[in-house]
Design a protein with these regions (language model features):
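A generic secondary-structure signal for well-formed alpha-helical elements
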Residues: 56-69, 204, 233, 257, ...
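Non-catalytic, mostly N-terminal accessory regions of nucleic-acid modification and defense proteins
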Residues: 1-224, 228-229, 291-300, 402-406, ...
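A conserved structural/catalytic subdomain of Rossmann-like adenosyl-cofactor enzymes
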Residues: 2-14, 20, 303, 307-531
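Conserved, well-folded catalytic cores of nucleic-acid-processing
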Residues: 35, 176, 180, 199, ...
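Conserved S-adenosyl-L-methionine
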Residues: 211-317, 322-324, 328-333, 338-343, ...
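Short small-residue beta-strand/loop micro-motif enriched in glycine and branched aliphatics
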Residues: 205-208, 262-263, 439-440
Length: 531
């Protein structure tokens, strides 16, 4: 027993130490990012910090790859010290394995070393980024590397009004990113570059308001969605997010399952070019090989890119809330096999359930989809009610979870999670009221680990808990006119103070009796005095 306690304490201490070091890393990174931007808006400046961090990562990743192999034969080998001509011999094999090639002179460490004396640093960097992308031309990795540096404009006025000012700012960025002691943190088991990148994106998103919320889902929500989608699955063929943003939801599956248990990889589609690039960079930074991620640019509803793929075992998404779409203005969509089963298209002013139907059509028979939804889709009438009726009658709705308000960047609305399955064991739907499962941190609410665990265990156990969750069958949902709002099925706890009217009445009667007795005593005393 003592041994187990000792091991548990050691594990807790390691976790605490890792958390402290992670916080230290985060504080350092954000301080550097803020100092670098100066008067430039943080949202506009993010491309430079994130882009140069990525450049450092791929440089070190590639150099370490060669050093690790060559030092088995020659302990003094250093890829960064080779001439470009000497390194050319490994170009082909490097592209096959890593997806791109960086000659020694173009590595981050060497560019950083020469930066203070390079009066054309912006030109140097632009040429390097162009050559990195060109190295993948004609290779299987081409689509995953092409345009990765497109948003990193080293000649932008955001860096300075003159050539010299821009070079000075770029030098400072290189020195700041290069000065981060990221290697020290790797000893703590922290996925340093990936962790730093996700932290920076979260901070930029939180400071950007609505625009930030469009590309980044908070980590704690991403983790909950992934674990719900993975219930009863120890491995999956692949995972899909049709509105993948920066890719944080997809990457949760690597963290929860391990990359080897996502056999065919990570699939996503993103409509915004900048966010699409952020997502691909995020994949590389989390050491996902180019052959295992398939992120494409385009409109998911009108131009789906993964329709020929085999169905997905896991689908997770946080689609844009009540965004407009073409809807029935395009009559061809009514014949689209994604939407036609419901017999109606989602309304033009709110595409939420169009995304839901799209995901359902891509889901495998043994798979699970976990989707963040705007609450209006649960109760609005018209076409959305007809789609809900279809989903209920076909027994696709496994669970509806009401989330706390103010969880997401850019909106304070209380959203919900809709869980879809094609292989339900019975016709019941679980409704969970998790609206109070949060801890307030600053201006936002957070789903802490205990909150996430409570929601997940409730989903897994599927047992009714008064005032927290309830099961409803098809008939009951039909009686509620296919309204899927959680408060229709989970009775709210009455927290008002209950006043016992009988108790004060009893006290009043007792006071009256005492008052009467005192009067009688007083009358007796007065009579005695008169005698």
């Amino acid at each position: 027993m003592e041994n187990k306690n000792t091991q548990a304490n050691e594990k807790n201490n390691e976790h605490a130490s890792s958390s402290l070091e992670r916080n230290e890393l985060h504080n350092t990174i954000w301080k550097v990012a803020n100092e670098l931007r100066g008067s430039v808006d943080g949202w506009d400046f993010k491309q430079y910090v994130l882009g140069i961090l990525f450049y450092r990562y791929i440089s070190e990743n590639m150099a370490n790859h060669h050093n690790e192999y060559e030092r088995k034969l020659d302990p003094s080998f250093d890829y960064a010290s080779l001439s470009d001509e000497e390194a050319e011999i490994v170009r082909k094999s490097t592209i096959e394995e890593k997806g791109f090639f960086i000659p020694p002179s173009a590595l981050f460490c060497n560019v950083l070393k020469n930066a203070p004396h390079n009066e054309d640093l912006n030109v140097t960097l632009q040429n390097i980024f162009t050559e990195i992308e060109k190295s993948s031309l004609g290779a299987p990795s081409e689509e995953n590397v092409k345009g990765l540096f497109a948003d990193l404009d080293v000649n932008s006025n955001k860096l300075g009004s003159s050539h010299q000012n821009r070079v000075e700012k770029l030098t400072k960025i290189l020195q700041a990113i290069g000065g981060m002691q990221l290697g020290d943190y790797q000893q703590s088991g922290i996925d340093v570059f990936g962790d730093a990148y996700e932290y920076l994106m979260a901070m930029y998103a939180s400071n950007a308001g609505k625009s930030g919320g469009e590309f980044f889902t908070p980590q704690e929500v991403s983790e909950l969605l992934a674990k719900i989608a993975l219930h009863n699955q120890e491995s999956i063929n692949k995972v899909y997010d049709p509105c993948c943003g920066s890719g944080s939801l997809l990457l949760q599956f690597s963290k929860v399952l391990g990359d080897k248990n996502v056999s065919k990889g990570y699939f996503g589609q993103e409509i915004n070019l900048t966010t699409y690039n952020l997502c691909r960079i995020n994949m590389f930074l989390h050491d996902i090989n180019y052959s295992k991620f398939h992120i494409v640019l385009g409109d998911t509803l009108l131009d789906p890119k993964h329709e020929d793929d085999e169905p997905f075992d896991a689908i997770v998404s946080n689609p844009p809330y009540s965004t407009k779409w073409v809807g029935d203005n395009n009559p061809l969509l009514m014949n689209d096999e994604r939407f036609s089963p419901a017999g109606v298209l989602a309304p033009k002013k709110a595409a939420d359930l169009a995304f839901t139907m799209h995901m359902l059509s891509y889901l495998s028979n043994q798979g699970t989809a976990a989707i963040v939804e705007f609450p209006g889709v649960l109760y609005r009438d018209g076409a959305e009610k007809k789609i809900r009726e279809y989903l209920v009658k076909e027994n696709f709705i496994d669970c509806v979870i009401a989330l706390p308000e103010n969880l997401f960047f850019g909106t304070s609305i209380a959203t919900c999670i809709l869980v879809l399955k094609k292989n339900k064991k019975d016709d019941t739907t679980l409704f969970i009221d998790a609206s109070k499962e949060f801890v307030k941190e600053g201006k936002k609410n957070k789903l802490k680990e205990r909150n996430r665990e409570k929601i997940l265990q409730t989903y897994i156990e599927r047992k009714e808990v008064k005032h927290f969750c309830a099961l409803a069958n098809m008939e009951e949902i039909k009686e509620n006119d296919y309204n899927l709002s959680v408060n229709r099925y989970v009775e709210q706890e009455d927290t008002k103070e209950i006043i016992d009217i009988k108790a004060p009445n009893g006290e009043i009667a007792q006071i009256v009796r005492k008052q009467s007795a005192l009067r009688n005593s007083l009358d007796f005393i007065i009579k005695e005095l008169e005698i």
